[in-house]
Amino acid sequence: MAQKEKIVEINGLIDHTNLKQNATAEDIKKLCAEAKQYKFATVAINSCWVSLAHAELEGSGVGITSCVGFPLGAASTAAKVAEAKQSVADGTTEIDMVINGGHLVAGDDDYVISDIKAVVEAAGSVPVKVILECCLLDDEQIVRACKDCMAAGAAFVKTSTGFSTGGATVHDVALMKQTVGDTCKVKAAVVAVGRDGAFRGLFVA
């Protein structure tokens, strides 16, 4: 495989991301232009920009990942559902929702499952990835979070938001994959600053 083809193949696994709170419309347009140029899988953006991204990316083959309950996951279920429904109406092709970490750590798995399931149902045919924020969890909590996601019908489990104390680690990704098997896919959130550290995490799952 030629080097250029390898780059395109790798780029097709990456969500090109701008989730900054001060991102402007021009920033999102630039993100979309880069995603089209380099053939990234999706642009990952805050939900207020989905309609703009949809217009910018129409016909390009690049998807849109709208982030719901981002970055804390502490919004009410009703708020997450409303955000998911609006994102779908605006043209998102994927949803990244953040798990309710407080209820998870407290052992309230019924709440966690209900919260995720409500968003999955609101999203309809749009796949939902659930961000666990692994840097705040121990191994037992990561395993339990993965099981809750499977029970709720999530399509993916994802390591982190990029807004907390750490990102993906090989250990966390391997533990998640071991737990979900083929029931869910696993996604590592990494900053692609170097081929070794960044992409090791990406390809474990």
Identify the role of each PLM range:
Residues 3-38, 42, 48-188, 195-205:
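Alpha/beta enzyme core
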